[in-house]
Amino acid sequence: MQTSTNYPRLGIMGGTFDPIHHGHLVAASEVADLFSLDRVLFVPTGQPWQKKNRTVTPAEDRYLMTTIATASNPRFSVSRVDIDRGGPTYTVDTLHDLHERYPHAELFFITGADAVARMATWRDCTEMMSLATFVAVTRPGYSLEKTELGPLGDSVTMVEVPAMAISSTNIRARARANRPIWYLVPDGVVQYIAKEKLYLPSGQVGASSMW
């Protein structure tokens, strides 16, 4: 694997990003500031193993939306490491690959507190926790005590970000219902969703109120 530019403190924002929204971007910015990160790398999942019960937008669309959303921030970039690996995406594999690519970086894995609550079920959880500092971003109204994580609790730092009240699930539902999604996602992502007719029920042609 080709070695990339060295960043001493590298944030890893993993997620399905279906679609990416302002909550993700604000969370990444807040964590970057709090932990003095040199760069935040957004890593769209290839095939999210924990979402087999629903249809996920194709990886290339999610990658392009993430690229559009992060383009204006010089501290942000996007990695295809999970998409190009193929097969189900497991965080332990993501972190191993990124350690190869950034051998001198200290990694900070940023994810939602709701995902962290299920972390004990993730593949090779103990090994995974040794590969990065885990930062759990919470949203208002969502409570997660470290004691709920058992022995993993001491390895996770909680950060509350108000903008995380926005959810990709709600955005998909609004798009399907022909309701506006402006200001929930970056402008370029609104335009991409409309152009590619993402999230619309089968056979529906347009979503004019999205504009």
Curated annotation (Swiss-Prot):
GO MF entries: ATP binding; nicotinate-nucleotide adenylyltransferase activity
SUPFAM superfamilies in UniProt: Nucleotidylyl transferase (SSF52374)
Catalyzed reactions per annotation: nicotinate beta-D-ribonucleotide + ATP + H(+) = deamido-NAD(+) + diphosphate
GO biological process: NAD biosynthetic process
Domain of life, per lineage: Bacteria
InterPro entries referenced in this protein's UniProt entry, alphabetically: Cyt_trans-like (IPR004821), NadD/NMNAT (IPR005248), Rossmann-like_a/b/a_fold (IPR014729)
EC number: 2.7.7.18
Keywords assigned by UniProt, alphabetized: ATP-binding, NAD, Nucleotide-binding, Nucleotidyltransferase, Pyridine nucleotide biosynthesis, Transferase
Pathway: Cofactor biosynthesis; NAD(+) biosynthesis; deamido-NAD(+) from nicotinate D-ribonucleotide: step 1/1
HAMAP family per the UniProt record, alphabetical: NaMN_adenylyltr
PANTHER family in alphabetical order: NICOTINATE-NUCLEOTIDE ADENYLYLTRANSFERASE-RELATED, PHOSPHOPANTETHEINE ADENYLYLTRANSFERASE
Function recorded in the entry: Catalyzes the reversible adenylation of nicotinate mononucleotide (NaMN) to nicotinic acid adenine dinucleotide (NaAD).
Family: Belongs to the NadD family.
Name of this chain's protein: Probable nicotinate-nucleotide adenylyltransferase
